[in-house]
């Protein structure tokens, strides 16, 4: 009797079936809270890794909920921070605390953290305005410095498998003298795209950030075929 062995190695790449969420925007205070509560718990939270940022919203909610069950959020301030984190990612936490008592015009800010939203199993979207203004004075030149930003932030998921994020703003600013000197030598606003001059020593620039997010799984399949004769 003779037999031969034929081994087939098949490698396939496919979209992962598990849910996919967008990232928590990188913010110093926001991430300080998360890192602080992990340190307070005295253990490593397995849902996210503090050395790898940004965190996934889905992982964040799973992590802080596990910390809450252990009694980490003890003070009034801790409970406030816990609810804030859950409200900001309510599509995963389903926080009832995020429901507005009096929505604006019945449809706006029905959730405290969202100007507009749609929460369907096949399509999830969150839309929020971006408004920012700041001013100061240059201690060397005495000039008044300022920045004014207006725009929109959009995030969501498609079928909970593909996440997407967009941040768009129009900005006017008078920047410090050393930045303007750099722009004079190399005509570009640092880290920005399209721009033009604006009034006295100011700049007008457009800022855009976006990404899509999905998981890819790599499967290694070994098939052994035995043939007997």
Name every feature range the model reports, one short phrase each.
Residues 5-8, 33, 180:
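Intrinsically disordered, low-complexity regions enriched in small/polar residues
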Residues 25-28, 40-58, 62-229:
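Outer-membrane beta-barrel channel domains
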Residues 21-37:
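Short N-terminal segments immediately surrounding and downstream of signal-peptide cleavage
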């Amino acid at each position: 009797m003779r037999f031969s062995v034929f081994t087939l190695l098949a490698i396939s790449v496919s979209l992962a079936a598990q849910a996919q969420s967008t990232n928590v925007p990188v913010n110093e205070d926001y991430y300080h809270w998360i890192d602080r509560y992990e340190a307070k718990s005295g253990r490593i939270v397995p849902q996210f890794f503090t050395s790898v940022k940004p965190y996934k919203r889905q992982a964040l909610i799973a992590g802080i909920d596990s910390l809450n069950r252990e009694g980490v959020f003890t003070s009034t301030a801790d409970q406030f921070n816990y609810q804030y984190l859950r409200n900001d990612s309510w599509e995963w936490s389903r926080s009832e605390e995020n429901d507005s008592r009096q929505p604006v015009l019945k449809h706006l800010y029905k959730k405290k953290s969202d100007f507009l939203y749609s929460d369907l199993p096949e399509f999830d979207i969150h839309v929020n305005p971006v408004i920012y203004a700041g001013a100061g004075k240059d201690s060397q030149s005495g000039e008044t410095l300022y920045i004014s930003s207006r725009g929109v932030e959009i995030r969501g998921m498609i079928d909970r498998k593909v996440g997407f994020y967009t941040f768009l703003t129009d900005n006017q600013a008078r920047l410090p003298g050393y930045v303007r000197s750099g722009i004079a030598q190399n005509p570009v606003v640092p880290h920005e795209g399209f721009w033009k001059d604006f009034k006295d020593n100011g700049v007008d620039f457009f800022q855009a950030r976006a990404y899509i997010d999905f998981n890819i799984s790599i499967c290694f399949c070994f098939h052994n075929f035995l043939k007997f004769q």
